[in-house]
Amino acid sequence: MFEFFLKKPKRVEKNWGYELIFANDEANNYCGKILHLYQGHKFSMHFHDIKCETFYILNGKVQVSLLDLTSKNGNISVHTLNAGDCLDLPRLQPHQVEAIEESDIIEASTFHRDEDSYRIWR
């Protein structure tokens, strides 16, 4: 017989809002979160050595800054994402998200490890 487990997501408070972690399975290498960002708040420019992420903008509007790793000058490209937009972030891609409006983002990724986040700047 198939077993299933009902559970509540884990809420993690952040300076920019909070995360609702509804899945983080190391054995099967996947993670699911909802990132809630308060208007005008952003998380640090950072990257992951192992983790790959896909963002789906559930509601609101965000600005995503991507650091160009091929540029010697550290060029940054800025992209506005609206509800319904998706963004794939490969491992090692520095990124920062700022909420233009209060926003919810569904994050689907490989397994999340706290020690796999490398901050470049706040």
Show the residue positions of the predicted features.
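Short beta-strand His + acidic residue motifs that chelate non-heme Fe in jelly-roll/DSBH
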Residues: 44-46, 64-65, 88-89, 94-100, ...
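His/acidic/aromatic-lined binding-pocket segments of jelly-roll/cupin-type domains
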Residues: 34-35, 46-47, 52-57, 79, ...
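ATP/adenylate-binding site constellation spanning eukaryotic-like Ser/Thr protein kinases
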Residues: 40, 59, 102
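Short acidic-glycine-tyrosine-enriched beta hairpin
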Residues: 68-92
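Short, surface-exposed loop/turn motifs at beta-strand boundaries within globular domains
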Residues: 27-30, 38, 49-50
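Glycine- and acidic-residue-biased ligand/ion/polar-headgroup-sensing regions
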Residues: 50-70
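Double-stranded beta-helix
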Residues: 4-9, 14, 70-71, 94-122
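A short, N-terminal "cap"/entry segment at the start of jelly-roll beta-barrel domains
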Residues: 1-33, 42-44, 75-79
